């Protein structure tokens, strides 16, 4: 993630490839000592890297290929959905972004409500608000603290 945040696409992909090999050797998703790791978690990190690099289409493609129900942690499942929401937001598919945010909120409300990235995305969606998303979006905006009740 650090490499992606620095804009180092090659470095990020190199780290992901190495993690993918280790996950493949492990063979299954594990949660030993609260350290979730395995093929699914590496897939989630691939999507996260794509979010950081602004590759919206790849985020959505990678996120759709992941079965988050294989992860024992609700927070990791929610994080995956937040990546998907950001990808849809970057792609300006606001209805899909909102659906992913609401799904993440159902899984781990405290996690979603405290994330600055969620607040920024909700503000962005409010600027582009459509009639079809307005009631649900405004309710979410209130819950995450970017719109007064």
Q: Which sequence ranges carry the predicted segments?
A:
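Conserved binding/catalytic microenvironments
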Residues: 1-149
């Amino acid at each position: 993630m650090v490499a992606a945040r620095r804009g180092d696409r090659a470095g990020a992909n190199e780290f992901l490839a190495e993690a993918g090999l280790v996950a493949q050797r492990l063979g299954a998703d594990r949660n030993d000592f609260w350290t979730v790791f395995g093929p699914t978690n590496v897939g989630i990190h691939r999507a996260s890297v794509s979010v950081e690099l602004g590759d919206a289409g790849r985020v959505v493609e990678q996120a759709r290929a992941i079965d988050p129900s294989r992860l024992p942690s609700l927070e990791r499942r929610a994080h995956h959905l937040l990546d998907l929401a950001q990808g849809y937001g970057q792609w300006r598919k606001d209805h899909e972004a909102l659906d992913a945010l609401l799904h993440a909120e159902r899984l781990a409300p405290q996690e979603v409500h405290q994330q600055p990235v969620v607040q920024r995305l909700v503000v962005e969606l409010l600027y582009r608000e459509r009639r079809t998303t307005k009631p649900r979006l405004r309710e979410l905006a209130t819950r995450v603290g970017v719109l007064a009740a």
